[in-house]
Amino acid sequence: MSRRVEFDLSTEDHSDRRRTNTFSSSADEDGVPNEVADYLVYFSRMVDEQNVPEILTLYDQAFPDLTERFFRDRMWPDENVVERIIGPGNKLFIILYKELYYRQLYARNTRGPLLVHRYESFMNYQELFSELLSSKDPIPLSLPNVWLWDIIDEFVYQFQAFCLYKANPGKRNADEVEDLINIEENQNAWNIYPVLNILYSLLSKSQIVEQLKALKEKRNPDSVADEFGQSDLYFKLGYFALIGLLRTHVLLGDYHQALKTVQYVDIDPKGIYNTVPTCLVTLHYFVGFSHLMMRNYGEATKMFVNCLLYIQRTKSVQNQQPSKKNFQYDVIGKTWDQLFHLLAICLAIQPQRIDESIASQLSERCGERMMHMANGNIDEFRNAFATGCPKFLSPTTVVYEGVNQSKEPLLRQTQSFLEGIESQMALPVLRGYLKLYTTLPTKKLASFMDVDDEHYDSFIGKLLTYKMIVNELGKEAGPSSADDDEPQTDIDFYVDRDMINIADTKVARHVGEHFIRHIQKLQEVQDVLKRLDIQKP
């Protein structure tokens, strides 16, 4: 349990204290403990004062602590009770409180909340984003990075949950069928179009794409941003909305658009996403998965390994903060195992050097499975994919009665994945033979692999397929990590008429070149700083 947080109300004037006592009496009548009432009053005041460090403590520590102590078996008070406690004129705080309320409702119902609660939660999100997007001037609101990310992440999650819910008749009772029919006819809740519209509107309002592009081109982002783009709140919401869109496009099976969405996001240790652990994991997981589905196995491997290394480094933090583990780190624990199975797929098709600590854990977890995959066992590929992939969705599928169809998108994506794998089943064996030679006649290699004359042309096609994988075609489709010029595979080759020429590309690391590259980067940064027009104080 996290440490208890005391709420200092001593700075209130006499009228504030008198008002608080009045609301505390009201809270007693509503069955709300005085400590919770004090928390809500103080929380509202901190949001109004834009005290971000204190808001972070109240959100990240106090809320889970009070939930554990007072609301393990019941819900937090509804908005009417909260409004009586904190007083009128706090519309934005009530909306933010309801976002927390419905998020807790989703978290504690294993079968999912009732349809009415799903609908009300969407209406609350719509009201929140309407407040932010329809204002003529930037809203004077400051929230911690983790809360801003959680708002976007939960919004996408609830959309995903609703799509799975309406495709599964077993998740609702008879009374909800008529309400679902009405919602679908009017398309006024959790429809794909308003969801995408909200996310893209956040991108447009914040000019986040233009700003990230300017940063990538070493230009001043303020030159392409208006007052909304220069607002810390809108910039961060737009940034997190990019990653929310990445996730949404992957769930819909549009991997090219997913990577295009984050093409200007620099995946480096100083990215904004790095301030929120679950955001970092989400970004790496979905970028890596997109590369996997587009058969860019080298890029996918980089994403998965970097993410696993990050989780490995932060495990001690998770263990020391059990209250956070239930809320912030839940997604990290679930993704940890998924990443290993996806990494196993990549390395079975395209072996390469990875961090030794990750390689050791991968061998323990998936060593036998990888051996079967390398030998062409298609069922092992299917099982690894099913374990590692996200829960795909079909936004237009509605089943009012009959068989559950929520897994149909998964079956389609699995079939698409396996079709690509089946065309590459011979590649691990092919690589094994190529490693033994520096030159090798194509006819001789074909005989090694029991390829007769009738299938010789298709065999040459497999050679070209493997060459494409080695060259990582399509790498430019998304963000990549540093040191891309260092070879990741241990062989390369080319075909000259009927002869295969093979080169061993496993080279020692050149430490000097590493420092030279970073010195050049430092010089580039210094040049950019010199060009910036910064007025001296």
UniProtKB/Swiss-Prot annotation:
List this protein's GO terms for biological process.
formation of cytoplasmic translation initiation complex; translational initiation
> Per the record, where are the segments of Basic and acidic residues compositional bias?
1-19
Q: Which GO MF terms does the UniProt record name?
A: translation initiation factor activity
List the residue ranges of the region (Disordered).
Answer: 1-30
Q: Where in the cell is it found?
A: Cytoplasm
PCI domain ranges (all copies): 299-487
* Any one cellular-component term (Gene Ontology): eukaryotic 43S preinitiation complex
Q: What keywords appear on the UniProt entry?
A: Cytoplasm, Initiation factor, Protein biosynthesis
The superkingdom of the source organism is: Eukaryota
Q: Name one Pfam family in it.
A: Paf67
InterPro entries on file: eIF3l (IPR019382), PCI_dom (IPR000717)
**Which family does the record claim for this protein?**
Belongs to the eIF-3 subunit L family.
Question: Can you state the subunit structure given in the record?
Answer: Component of the eukaryotic translation initiation factor 3 (eIF-3) complex.
Query: Briefly, what is this protein's role?
Result: Component of the eukaryotic translation initiation factor 3 (eIF-3) complex, which is involved in protein synthesis of a specialized repertoire of mRNAs and, together with other initiation factors, stimulates binding of mRNA and methionyl-tRNAi to the 40S ribosome. The eIF-3 complex specifically targets and initiates translation of a subset of mRNAs involved in cell proliferation.
Q: From the Swiss-Prot or TrEMBL record, give the protein name.
A: Eukaryotic translation initiation factor 3 subunit L
